[in-house]
Amino acid sequence: MGSRLLQFQSYGKWFMLLSLATAICLLHLPSYSCTYSRDLPICTPQVSFQLTNTTPTATLFLSTVKEVSMLLSYVAIDLGWNVNFPKPNDYDTSNLVNTFDPSNKYHVNLFGYCKWQPLSNKATWYCMDNPNGLDIISMIVRDLGAQLGVLSHTNTKILSDSLWILYRSIFDSFYKFVHDDDYRADKVASFLQSLQQGGPLPSVDQFKTVTLLLKCFEKLTNAIQVTELCSFALIIIAIALATVACVMDILAAREEKHSATSDKLPKALFFKQITLKLSYAVVTCSLFYQIGMAVYFLALFSIRYPYDYKVKVMTFNPDTGYWLSVLRFVMEFWFAVACYIGLSLSRRRPSKEVDDLDWKDEEQTPDSGETAICVSTRGSTRIQV
């Protein structure tokens, strides 16, 4: 009865451990949503944001970019005439690019985004993959390219990627231009001052600071993606090794019923040790992920609540995917604790069984030629003459 109870406890321990690891693995899946509109348009975003026109700066900014996007829309419609000759209503404002419309709401995830556009005459909801993940600027550029692709009857994915490549080329060239030569940066500042008709002269340091912050923001979003991928891969490997260790442990327990030793017990202990180290690695990756997300939200909060409220251009909120990642981090921590406790008990088990052996007569040993009786706590008696 006692051996069955111990066996049941061992099976229950493995069942709980594998169930916890499987739940952690399933909680990683929402991070890969918000990528496709067809078939299963599920989205559990990390963050949701909207552009706002409640401040003078935001109103001026949105009106400017809207005029530019309207011009691009007209060009895109004219370029698609060979596929479908444009109709007069195609030039209506409701059919043009609305990337910068304040009514739109963007749901951003690590590898894609979804867009809710209630004022559109076409699709009010669609999702697209975005390799740049949480980089909001890259996401807006890709969305602009996708809408231009629809207007010009071109492959939206190709045009979206092409526009992003153009943006990256311009940004990298400007970054190198500003940081390599202060004289050229001063000339750019003077040119911008002439456009502002005697406004304040932008300094070279301002150009350097803005471009450097954008560069750091891009690297931060890439680092968040890498930590998520590493954490997901490690937990999958940990589940596989924990399953192997569970099978080895069960086979070793069955062999011990018929013999004193089992060659599968050291193998099970080896796989348990690797699983424990992987659980530590999973927690470490998730910790860096949470730190990266905290820095990311601090950067967005600096935009949402700037020092000068008049320059507020967007509002954002952490969304369902982020809170699920926090829950996943807590579960990963307890998974590592459970692995540590299980390995500690496995290490104590062999030594305890040896210590429980009690020779009835210390003077009568197997070498003395007399009968020696060894009683084990496992309930079996061995007699050697």
From Swiss-Prot:
Keywords: Membrane, Sporulation, Transmembrane, Transmembrane helix. It is found in: Prospore membrane. Its main location: membrane. Residues 1-13, 253-280, 344-385 are cytoplasmic. One of its GO terms (biological process) is sporulation resulting in formation of a cellular spore. One of its GO terms (cellular component) is prospore membrane. Disulfide bonds: none annotated. The chain crosses the membrane at residues 14-34, 232-252, 281-301, 323-343. Residues 35-231, 302-322 are lumenal. It is a multi-pass membrane protein. Involved in spore and ascus formation. Required for the efficient assembly of the precursors of the prospore membrane to a continuous prospore membrane. Belongs to the SMA2 family. This is Spore membrane assembly protein 2. The gene is SMA2.
